[in-house]
């Protein structure tokens, strides 16, 4: 596969190889991984697998290959140890080993529904319970270079992939695929004119948990997708994303890859000025390390103003997005915005989101 495979697929491959070792089956250099969106299994390379502790448990190792392009998981070793659960109850028990992210210190394994489904699909059914521990030896180190901490994920990398193949959010091919997906979605006879546009893996995972539909995931090419949605006949479009991402739209930045443009704290400071913040409060925003930290600093001195600024941000995202689309044509599509915070709470919504999508939120 030229696009490479996401981390959950490599975890599932190592887990399946580990289970085969536990069952006493001979080692195979490739694990057959069943995927929810493919009729045929995918053969995924595995480095090694062996029984441990006198056959009471087994360990297998795979190495992540995300395909071409920059990706911090490249060559990341994935260790998966499996053992039978003592009580012999059916089902999987997933454990976060070293280097795997959890929800807060000592919290649950941070795993997406897709990643969990892959493991269950490839390891079950069994006539007894199976404990699966995932270990990423370099996960804690690599997590420092991600935005995991902004979402409350600590101690390592989160297993939050929502598909098998890696998508490059800044690549032109990724935009082409999103536009094809948009055309297919809006061309469906069941399409009724509403669309939730989600930004990034966390947004997609959160939207699915909230049972929002229909969904279209977009990377950094937001501007062209907004215009294409209007052209395709979307009537009501809801933008759902992390506040640290959607804030760029409030500043008129519609290709959001950080290599091209940032300006997040500058935009937030300008919105704070419009909202009437004091000079001292504006300095808190301007010199914060992130949008999340800026809101926390403001909330510490004036919680009501922090909440007002968040609502102002959601409104600005709606207004600037609507103005962007209007530059290219006269369509009836209305754009709403909902922003979530590091705790993955749908925190702020603009007036259009409240008017057109309030049933999704309440």
Swiss-Prot record:
InterPro entries per the UniProt record, alphabetical: CbiD, CbiD_sf
Keywords: Cobalamin biosynthesis, Methyltransferase, S-adenosyl-L-methionine, Transferase
Keyword match rRNA-binding: no
Gene3D superfamilies linked: CbiD-like
Reactions accelerated catalytically: Co-precorrin-5B + S-adenosyl-L-methionine = Co-precorrin-6A + S-adenosyl-L-homocysteine
Keyword DNA repair: no
Gene Ontology biological process terms in this record: anaerobic cobalamin biosynthetic process; methylation
EC primary class: transferase
E.C. number(s) listed in UniProt: 2.1.1.195
Highest taxon listed in the record's lineage: Bacteria
Alphabetized GO MF terms: cobalt-precorrin-5B C1-methyltransferase activity
Pathway: Cofactor biosynthesis; adenosylcobalamin biosynthesis; cob(II)yrinate a,c-diamide from sirohydrochlorin (anaerobic route): step 6/10
One Pfam family linked to the record: CbiD
SUPFAM superfamilies, per database record: CbiD-like (SSF111342)
Family to which this protein belongs: Belongs to the CbiD family.
NCBIfam families: cbiD
Identification of the protein by name: Cobalt-precorrin-5B C(1)-methyltransferase
Species whose genome carries this gene: Synechococcus sp. (strain CC9902)
Organism lineage string: Bacteria, Bacillati, Cyanobacteriota, Cyanophyceae, Synechococcales
């Amino acid at each position: 596969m030229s696009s490479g495979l996401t981390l959950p697929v490599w975890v599932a491959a190592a887990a399946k190889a580990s289970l085969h070792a536990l069952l006493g089956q001979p080692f195979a250099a490739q694990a057959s991984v069943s995927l929810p969106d493919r009729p045929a299994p995918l053969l995924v390379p595995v480095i090694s697998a062996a029984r441990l502790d006198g056959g009471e448990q087994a360990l297998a190792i795979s190495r992540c290959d995300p395909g071409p392009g920059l990706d911090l998981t490249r060559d990341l070793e994935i260790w998966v140890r499996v053992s039978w659960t003592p009580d012999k109850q059916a089902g999987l028990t997933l454990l976060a080993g070293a280097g795997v992210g959890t929800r807060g210190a000592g919290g649950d394994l941070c795993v997406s529904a897709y990643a969990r489904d892959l493991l269950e699909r490839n390891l079950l059914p069994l006539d007894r319970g199976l404990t699966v521990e995932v270990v990423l030896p370099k996960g804690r180190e690599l997590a420092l270079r991600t935005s995991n901490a902004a979402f409350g994920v600590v101690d390592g990398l989160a297993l939050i992939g929502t598909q098998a193949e890696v998508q490059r959010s800044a690549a032109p091919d990724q935009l082409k695929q999103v536009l094809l997906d948009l055309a297919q979605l809006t061309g469906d006879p069941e399409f009724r004119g509403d669309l939730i546009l989600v930004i990034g893996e966390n947004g997609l995972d959160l939207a699915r948990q909230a049972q929002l539909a229909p969904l279209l995931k977009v990377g950094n090419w937001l501007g062209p997708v907004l215009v294409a949605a209007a052209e395709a006949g979307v009537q009501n479009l809801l933008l759902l994303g992390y506040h640290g991402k959607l804030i760029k739209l409030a500043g008129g930045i519609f290709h959001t890859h950080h290599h091209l443009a940032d300006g997040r704290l500058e935009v937030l400071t300008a919105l704070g000025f419009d909202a009437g913040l004091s000079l001292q409060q504006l300095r808190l925003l301007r010199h914060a390390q992130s949008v999340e930290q800026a809101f926390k600093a403001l909330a510490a001195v004036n919680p009501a103003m922090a909440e007002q600024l968040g609502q102002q941000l959601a409104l600005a995202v709606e207004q600037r997005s609507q103005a962007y689309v209007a530059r290219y044509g006269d369509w009836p599509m209305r754009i709403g915005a909902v922003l979530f915070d590091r705790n993955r709470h749908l925190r702020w919504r603009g007036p259009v989101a409240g008017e057109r999508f309030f049933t999704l939120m309440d």
